[in-house]
């Protein structure tokens, strides 16, 4: 009897200590991530990790189960099955705690964080841009003259950032009312109260404004569910923080450029023409504002070049990424990349007065510095 109570008490104490350590470490990780990487990685990566959530849930369940089992036991009664189950959960908590220490140490490394953001970005790109690029440039409905809208639906309630739009429901409503609905902001935009949310063209009286507003999700911070540009934003912010004078870690910036290069290779082969959403009959029903190829290229290279051109490592890695993209992407994607290559040449000429540094900065290197300038098949 005494031994069972002592065992349950030890399990409760151990799981309480595990919980304190876990949440304390999470707070430290949040501070480190916000200070050395970017605050935007906290909500998208750290607080959404299912492994940390599951292990924390195991600790809480084990603590409550062991404490409740101790409360059920009378003075001369031992609930052997419950004590055995509590002991199993206690052992599982110990194993999970040891695993969590190793997992957290690997998870908080820069390469792991940027790789996870890259994986999330790939998933969002594949879900938003599902069709391959055709190479045919077509003027979207968004840029065609439609005249003044027949009705403007404005934002009501609280202001916020557009997180997602239920496009399927919008198309269904537009088809039933025989109208064209233009969603004015872009996913990721901040919308203030009384700011235009929808433009309606056609039989606008058949649509309820309040039901239309419920098809848009708002929040206080951007997410990646329907916003592939946000993955680029996070990676660029990590690179910029690494290039700041306070941190001065261009190698971490190179890791971020690796993932930007990877995302651009994927998005460059996709059709970005998703402004017009058609119904089953082929008629345009919903018009959205979406990023084009130039937007993705600009966010990937402009700021990093601006703040990192003085680093030979960054200049070489940017050049390697751009030249590789020109080689592997379709012809209609090359013009924006050639402009960035020209801007890199101008920037390094301004930042590197010595001919030797200038010549070195003009050599593409996928490692930044340390990679071979020319691949050879025979090395002696």
Over which residues does each language-model region extend?
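Transmembrane alpha-helix detector for multi-pass membrane proteins
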Residues: 2-73, 94, 98-101, 239
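Short basic (Lys/Arg) and small-residue
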Residues: 77-83, 99-182, 186-187, 195-380
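N-terminal start-of-domain structural block
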Residues: 64-65, 89-92, 377-379
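Hydrophobic alpha-helical transmembrane segments
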Residues: 8-10, 78-90
């Amino acid at each position: 009897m005494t031994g069972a109570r002592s065992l349950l008490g030890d399990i409760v104490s151990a799981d309480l200590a595990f919980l304190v350590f876990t949440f304390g470490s999470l707070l430290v990780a949040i501070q480190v991530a916000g200070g050395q990487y970017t605050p935007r990685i906290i909500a998208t990566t750290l607080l959404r990790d299912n492994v940390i959530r599951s292990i924390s849930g195991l600790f809480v369940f084990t603590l409550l189960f062991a404490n409740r089992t101790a409360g059920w036991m009378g003075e001369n009664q031992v609930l052997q099955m419950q004590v055995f189950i509590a002991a199993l959960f206690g052992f599982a908590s110990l194993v999970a705690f040891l695993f969590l220490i190793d997992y957290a140490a690997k998870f908080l490394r820069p390469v792991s964080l940027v790789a996870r953001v890259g994986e999330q970005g790939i998933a969002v790109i594949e879900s938003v841009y599902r069709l391959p690029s055709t190479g045919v440039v077509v003027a979207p409905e968004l840029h065609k003259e439609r005249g003044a809208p027949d009705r403007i639906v404005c934002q009501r309630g609280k202001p916020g950032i557009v997180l997602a739009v239920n496009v399927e429901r919008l198309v269904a409503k537009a088809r039933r009312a025989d109208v064209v609905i233009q969603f004015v902001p872009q996913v990721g935009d901040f919308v203030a109260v009384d700011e235009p949310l929808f433009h309606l063209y056609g039989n606008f009286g058949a649509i309820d404004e309040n039901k239309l507003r419920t098809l848009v999700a708002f929040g206080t911070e951007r997410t990646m569910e329907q916003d592939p540009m946000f993955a680029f934003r996070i990676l660029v912010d990590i690179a910029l923080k690494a290039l700041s004078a306070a941190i001065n870690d261009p190698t971490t910036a190179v890791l971020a450029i690796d993932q930007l290069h990877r995302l651009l290779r994927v998005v460059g082969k996709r059709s970005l023409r998703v402004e017009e959403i058609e119904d089953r009959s082929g008629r345009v029903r919903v018009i959205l504002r979406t990023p084009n190829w130039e937007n993705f290229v600009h966010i990937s290279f402009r700021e990093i070049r601006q703040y990192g051109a003085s680093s030979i490592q960054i200049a070489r890695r940017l050049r390697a990424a751009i030249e590789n993209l020109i080689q592997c992407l379709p012809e209609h994607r090359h013009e924006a990349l050639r402009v960035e290559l020209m801007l890199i040449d101008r920037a390094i000429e301004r930042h590197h007065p010595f001919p030797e540094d200038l010549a070195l900065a003009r050599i593409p290197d996928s490692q930044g510095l340390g990679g071979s300038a020319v691949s050879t098949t025979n090395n002696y």
